[in-house]
Structure formats: C-alpha cells, structure tokens
Swiss-Prot record:
Role played: Catalyzes the specific phosphorylation of arginine residues in proteins.
SUPFAM superfamilies listed in its UniProt record: Glutamine synthetase/guanido kinase
The EC number(s) this enzyme carries: 2.7.14.1
GO cellular component: extracellular space
GO molecular function per UniProt: ATP binding; creatine kinase activity; protein kinase activity
Transmembrane segments: none
Family: Belongs to the ATP:guanido phosphotransferase family.
Domain Phosphagen kinase C-terminal span(s) in chain numbering: 12-240
Designated name of the protein: Protein-arginine kinase
Binding site for ATP: 15-19, 162-166, 193-198
InterPro entries noted in UniProt: Arg_Kinase, ATP-guanido_PTrfase, ATP-guanido_PTrfase_cat, Gln_synth/guanido_kin_cat_dom
C-alpha cells in the first residue's frame, strides 16, 4: 500500500510529494546517451546503490523488458511518474515499503521522489535528502557553485527540486474562484492545476500546488513558500465551507448524500462522473456528514477507477462499456465495506 493513501486525519490536503533530480559529473545528459553509455551509467549507479544498501530494498523495473503495465499503475498514483522521454532505457526502483521511488535515465540521470499523506513536505524532503547524501558519498554530481545542480532542462537548474501538494478544493472550485487563485499564485512562482481534466475542464476538484522556481531559492525557501501558500488555500477553502448559509448547507448535504447513494448503487459509470461524485463523498467525510467511510476508502477509489489501473488488473485491455461496469463494481466494493 502506498503510504499517502492512509491519511492521519480528515484533512483537506491529500498528500505531499518531493522529487529531486541529479546528473553525474562527466557523463552526458540522458537524452544524448547511447546504449553503451547508458549501460556504463546503469552499472555505476546500481553498484553505488548496492554499496549503500538501497538495491535490496527495492523492486527494479526495466521498461525495455516489457513491464509497461507496472508503470501504468504508478502513472495513476497522483502522477508519481509522469514523463517518460526515454522509455527504452528507463529504470524504475520502487522501495518495497513504499517510502520512495528512484528513476534512472528519466528526465535526468537520477530522480528520487517520495510521497506521503497530508501536508508533510518537510518530512518528505528530509527522507529524500538523507538518501541523496548517501548517494553523493559514492557518486560525484554535476554541480556548479553559482548555478547549483546542473540539469538538461533549464527549468530544473539550481536546487533541481520539485515539491507538490495535492489538495481538495471543492468549494473554491464550485464558486469559480480557482481561475483567479491560479493567476495570483503564478505571480508568486507557484502553479495550481487540476490533476484530472476532461478537455479544458477541471474534474474531481483535486489540485496540485507546485513550485515553478528552482534557481535562486534554497530548498528550505521553496518548501516554506509552498507550505505557506497551501495553508492559505486551506484557510480559503474552510472559509467557503464555514460561511455557507443554512439553505446552501442543506443543498450541499443533499448533494453529498445523493452522490454517496449513486456511487453505492451504480452499475456503470464513466471516470468524470465518478470523480465528481467521489469529490462530494470526500467532502462529506471531511465535514463529518458521512461517518461510515474513511478518506482512505475515498483515496483508494479515486486511484483504482482510473483506466490504466483497471486495465492493469485485467488480463487483456477491456472495452469502454466493460470499463464503466468494472469501475462501478470497484466503487461499490470500496464504499460498501
């Protein structure tokens, strides 16, 4: 079980994720490595991981060996893996305890990422930083005293740190405040985007808050900024909830319980409709309106109903109608237990 799925409380914040990117001194960037150079890189890095006792703690997945289905599974895990520019030579190390993931030859030579529940950016970064220090004792990174960590993508230059918070903002979304907030945050070097989309429309009310800048700020500055912004978003969402009129609250409660009834009894449902109703159900749990469910159940449902997840559990790829039926079955089983 991935750790973030089990939250500590009924938090608006679902999970925090940190990823750092590193390149090895004296080796070409990932995009221009040939096969022999990649094998040399792999031998060096895996040898290092064995020395510092990482390798035995991980499952090692090689995409070139035809294990794309396993990667599809993680693509649905709130974007644990998103970009595969070098699919043939991508190596994925998944910690057996779900504490961290390491990607070799993805965006850069090494990518280390960790996700945990709630607003826990500092704790997540601490885990990654400790692991990074162990690796750096054995491998010399590409580093410049003025520019910081050197990367093939200029957007990652500097700290080469990407921090993200996944947050549930149904009231801000329904009151059409998200677009205004997105534009304001962009001015502060922060991106706010929906993790689920249908065309140009946000779906599911789950948003990713992430840093844009990696250069000219320390790791601490980046994390502190993101935590501060997230706390402001939490406060704004709570204010929307607290300031509902009596009639608005009654309607919201009715919408929440209707959504729960539909999901517990549906036979066939598409992804967007399911995410819409699951957002209502999650809100119901957060507000204490729904007492016989946990956020763990809702989080699990949101992940398990994604197309790649359903296909991953099937022997062969299933058609759209069968996908809808299987999705409804997953939701019924998850929300009725």
């Amino acid at each position: 079980m991935v750790q973030w799925i089990s939250p500590l409380d009924n938090s608006i914040v679902i999970a925090s994720k940190v990823k750092i990117l590193r390149n090895i001194k004296g080796i070409k960037f990932t995009k221009i490595l040939n096969e022999d150079e990649f094998n040399d890189l792999l031998s060096m890095v895996l040898g290092c991981f064995k020395e510092i006792d990482i390798l035995d703690k991980c499952y090692v997945v090689k995409l070139k060996d035809g294990e794309e289905k396993i990667i599809d599974y993680y693509k649905e895990n709130f974007g644990l893996i998103k970009y595969f520019e070098n699919k043939d030579n991508l190596i994925f190390l998944m910690n057996k305890n779900g504490e961290f993931n390491i990607l070799l030859n993805e965006e850069e030579h090494i990518g280390i990422e960790c996700t945990n529940s709630g607003l826990s950016l500092r704790e997540v970064y601490s885990k990654i930083d400790n692991l990074d220090d162990l690796i750096e004792e054995k491998i010399h990174y590409s580093f410049d005293s003025e520019l910081g960590y050197l990367t093939s993508n200029i957007k990652n230059l500097g700290t080469a740190l990407r921090a993200k918070v996944f947050i549930h903002l149904p009231l801000l979304s329904s009151n059409n405040l998200i677009k205004i907030i997105k534009n304001a945050l962009k001015e502060e070097g922060i991106t706010l985007r929906s993790i689920y989309n249908s065309g140009n429309k946000d779906v599911g009310n789950i948003y990713e808050v992430s840093n844009i800048k990696t250069l000219g700020m320390s790791e601490k500055d980046i994390l502190d900024s993101l935590i501060s912004i997230t706390n402001k978003l939490i406060l704004r969402e709570k204010n929307q909830r607290d300031n509902l009129s009596k009639d608005e609250y009654i309607k919201l409660k009715d919408d929440i319980l209707r959504a729960l009834g539909i999901l517990r009894n549906t036979y066939s449902i598409d992804r967007d409709e399911a995410l819409k109703y699951l957002s209502y159900v999650r809100l119901g749990v957060e507000l204490g309106i729904i007492e016989d469910l946990t956020l763990k159940s809702v989080n699990s449902a949101m992940i398990e109903i994604q197309p790649d997840m359903i296909n991953n559990s099937s022997i062969k790829k299933i058609d759209i109608q069968s996908l809808k039926i299987e999705r409804a079955k997953i939701i019924r089983n998850t929300l009725n237990t």
